[in-house]
A protein has these predicted regions:
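Thiamine diphosphate
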Residues: 1-147
Length: 147
């Protein structure tokens, strides 16, 4: 969005979720915010309680601010366009552990493998498990396991 001159504001963060189903908070930054927002719209259409948080500063992470932000949510989903080991999702998991927060975490990112394929960003993300539909399906499957 930022590369298109838009600064998105995602609804839901300021309002505590209301029902007893596990609530979903998608944490992302940069380019993947667009995909996070598209997934968010699908989740809302299908009656899931969800929000998207732009973690615009990945490091250092502030435990107090983070704790307040994610307090109403049961499931945290980290969405990144790099490999999972040592990435954004790992930093979030460390913060959750260090703060003794009780949250279920689903990390979504690129697989830990060499990608020997050429193409633009959209093509490479879509062919490596980061299409909007695949992200949505991973979240819904994880959500079902948390009930």
């Amino acid at each position: 969005f930022l590369d298109m001159g838009m600064f998105p504001v995602f609804p839901g963060l300021a309002e505590p979720p209301s029902n007893s189903r596990p609530k979903i908070c998608i944490l992302s930054s940069g380019y993947m915010l667009g995909r996070a927002h598209d997934v968010y719209k699908k989740l809302i259409e299908d009656k899931y309680e969800a929000t998207v948080v732009d973690v615009w500063k990945v490091k250092p992470l502030d435990l107090q601010h983070f704790s307040r932000t994610v307090a109403p949510y049961d499931i945290l989903v980290t969405l990144e366009e790099q490999t999972l080991s040592g990435g954004f999702g790992s930093a979030i998991c460390e913060l959750i552990t260090d703060g003794s927060l009780k949250k279920s975490v689903l990390r979504i990112g690129l697989p830990e493998k060499y990608i020997f394929e050429n193409g633009n960003r959209e093509h490479l993300l879509n062919t490596n498990g980061l299409s909007v539909e695949e992200i949505y399906e991973k979240i819904v499957k994880f959500h079902r396991c948390q009930k």
